[in-house]
A protein has these predicted regions:
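Peptidyl-prolyl cis-trans isomerase
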Residues: 176-180, 184, 356-362, 408-416
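Non-catalytic, conformational "gating/processing" segments within enzyme and secreted inhibitor domains
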Residues: 1, 192-193, 389, 396, ...
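M16 family metallopeptidases and their MPP-like homologs
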Residues: 25-36, 62-174, 195-199, 207-210, ...
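Proteolytic maturation boundary segments
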Residues: 1-20, 26, 62, 165-279
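Glycine-rich, charged/polar anion/phosphate-binding loops
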Residues: 12-17, 33, 71-76, 180-182, ...
Length: 424
């Protein structure tokens, strides 16, 4: 073990504010002191962050995005070896009519108002249980991936954690009580935090100041020589793993009707299912699908089911649903536990048939598109992408085929709902 001098971690006292012009668009970050990895409060704090925002969009902060009050917002925990932080990131909405971003001050006020619900313990046992089940399902999915397993093993080395903590993760999550979560939320999400106002900067891609070379000579390595450490690593025996190839013959096919076909395969790893509905239409023929699909990710259900209520209904079934679209196809992707597959499919079918899109979300989406397109001319990366796309595809380039900026303001809920229903 490497012995290092541990310096005391700075604790925020009251509200501290810092500002910096370092990005293409404004952002707000609220940063709180957290805990180091392996701390007894780490899992409870992760649950707190999930109560604020999660992949199912059922969190307290997720509601701000679903309601169109903020363009994007999320909470996360970063627990390192010696210290940790809790961070809330938010992107203000862009008002296309007034051609301006909402202020950092107004966004911070909205976020803090919602955060008080967590600080005051305003959540019930059912909500907490849904969050815990979602964390367990995501853990099961990670265990299907060799890449994620390797990442977890590397994190054990970095943080000095006990491997049994990973094996027993699900049991530890199940054991966390609502009283523990409320106590931890009140302890760490307090009035002591750093408010980082990241402001829009001009000419970020312009050529910067040229730095002088350092005064010292570079370290010269001996060509062909090996360090003792390299020799030790090479001496470690490596056993070749048994490669298990995919057996495509195990995939079952069934014709549902004249236009639909089912492909099915059993998941031998766990009880988690993943399902993808693939429709043979994309933005190449229906450009407005880009915006209809974006709204579907935060949609409710007719006649009167609001977006958050629909998300929580999915959450109670421990299912997660997302919509996506590319040039040629539209996708509806859902994952969850097999025991709730039928109920989750029934709920999803109702939303596909009777979507309830939100006008406030549409205005936020239009504002986001306006803001993004305004920054394109000052972004070398975007200009390079546009030029490459034109060289490859000429007039069929996505940048030329997309909806003109002047027409975005005319998008309506009725039109986008019709587009989505026509695609399905």
């Amino acid at each position: 073990e490497i012995h290092r001098e541990k310096k005391p971690v700075r604790q925020f006292k009251g509200r501290t504010e810092k500002s910096a012009k370092i990005f293409y668009y404004p952002m707000l970050a609220l940063i709180y002191n957290g805990v180091p990895s392996n701390d007894k409060d780490e899992i409870a704090l992760e649950i707190c962050c999930q109560l604020l925002s999660n992949s199912q969009k059922t969190g307290i902060l997720d509601k701000l995005q679903l309601d169109g009050d903020i363009m994007s917002v999320g909470a996360s925990q970063n627990a390192m070896r010696d210290a940790g932080i809790l961070m809330i990131n938010a992107i203000p909405s862009f008002d296309a009519n007034q051609n301006r971003w909402d202020s950092h001050k107004s966004v911070e006020k909205i976020v803090l108002s919602s955060l008080r619900q967590l600080q005051n313990g305003e959540f019930d046992e059912a909500t907490l249980e849904a969050i815990k089940q979602n964390m367990i399902r995501e853990y099961d999915l990670q265990m299907e991936s060799n890449e994620m397993k390797a990442y977890i093993l590397a994190s054990l080395f970095n943080t000095g954690a006990d491997p049994s903590d990973i094996v027993n993760f699900k049991e530890k999550v199940k054991a966390v009580t609502i009283d523990e979560v409320k106590a931890v939320a009140k302890k760490y999400f307090n009035d002591n935090y750093l408010a980082l106002n990241i402001q829009e900067a001009k000419n970020l891609d312009s050529k910067g100041q040229k730095l002088k070379k350092p005064d010292y000579k570079p370290i010269e390595t001996k060509k062909g020589a090996k360090s003792e450490y390299a020799k030790w690593v090479e001496s470690i025996p490596v056993n070749m793993p048994e490669v298990k190839y995919c057996d495509f013959n195990s995939i079952q096919q069934k014709q549902i009707n004249t236009r639909s076909k089912l492909f099915y395969n059993l998941n031998p790893e766990n009880d988690v299912f993943t399902m993808t509905l693939k429709y043979g239409i994309g933005t190449k023929k229906m450009p407005k699908l880009e915006y209809a699909v974006a709204l579907m990710n935060n949609a409710g259900m007719l006649p009167d089911i609001e977006p958050l209520a629909f998300k929580r209904a999915m959450g109670e079934l421990n299912a997660n649903c997302t919509y996506a679209v590319d040039d040629n196809y539209m996708y509806v992707m859902m994952s969850g536990y097999e025991k709730d597959l039928v109920k989750a499919c029934q709920l999803l079918s109702k939303q596909i048939l009777f979507p309830k899109l939100d006008d406030k979300q549409l205005q936020s989406l239009i504002g986001s598109a306006f803001g993004s397109r305004q920054m394109e001319k000052s972004s070398i990366g975007t200009l390079e992408s546009a030029l490459t796309s034109y060289v490859l595809y000429k007039d069929s380039s996505d940048y030329l085929q997309r909806i003109p900026t002047r027409d975005l303001i005319d998008l309506s809920i009725t039109d986008l709902t019709t587009q989505f229903q026509a695609a399905t």
